[in-house]
Amino acid sequence: KNSFYRLAERVLGIKENDIIEFFGAVEHPILYCDCKEHHFHVPAYSRVIIRDVDTLEPLENGKPGLVNLITPMVKATPILSVMTDDLGVLHNGDECPCGLKTPFLEIVGRVAPEDIKTCAAGAEEIIRGLNV
């Protein structure tokens, strides 16, 4: 992330404090916005469970696993819980100096094999093919 922030400042002139990052999933209507420390705090109307990659059992905070997003705010489909192919770590809110006390999510990678294409990857491939 830090190299991205340096690149954005060098190429675009955008300071790190002016960069706002979001995390979300197409099937989950909640956006996780970063705080001034660039942590994705979990809003009050959502929950995040980190699950063991092999057993899908919930893990305690601080351990990496699959990101499971939960919210009752879904209106279009009867889906309350979405398991992603993202790897993440859930941290206690008091570990962040920004002042927000809700837990925050750190994305550390993906588990999807390279031959599986997500919606975003498919869209990127189409856009590249258009030479835009």
Residue positions per predicted region:
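Active-site glycine/GP-rich loop and adjacent strand/helix microenvironment
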Residues: 1-132
